[in-house]
Amino acid sequence: EKSEEGVVISNFVGYMFDKACEFEVKKIYFIGELGKFVKVAGGIFHTHSRVSDAKMEILAANALLVGEKLENVYKILESNTTEEASGYIEKKEVFNLLAEKAKQKCEEHCRKNGWNLEVETLILSAEKEVIGHSKHFFDNF
């Protein structure tokens, strides 16, 4: 039976994916803002800033991977928020790269715990506009 339920997960990404697997969820459409996705793309599953914070480093590394200008990478590293940092990004494909990495990290997290869960990801700007998504996010819409 197909269900289309939405759940707010706060900072406990790993815990919520574990619970989804326990309830035998087959597919999750993971939607959220850039700051959370940057951390998950880096393999961080408890995203509260008191526990973990490497957003700018992860964002800068991925910006380099897509060929972002070095001067912009330095500005990203000096930014206070991912919203500010995103203003320095010219190579917008970095957002799709982050979405794809977050998808892979979530699926790997579940596989390590013995579950097979399909995840698709969508990244929103602070203004709630779509800025990135995994390759197959829109396939079933």
Specify the residue positions occupied by each region the protein language model found.
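A structural signal for small-residue-enriched, beta-sheet-centric alpha/beta enzyme cores
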Residues: E1-N96, L122-L124
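Extended hydrophobic packing segments that form well-structured cores
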Residues: A99-F141
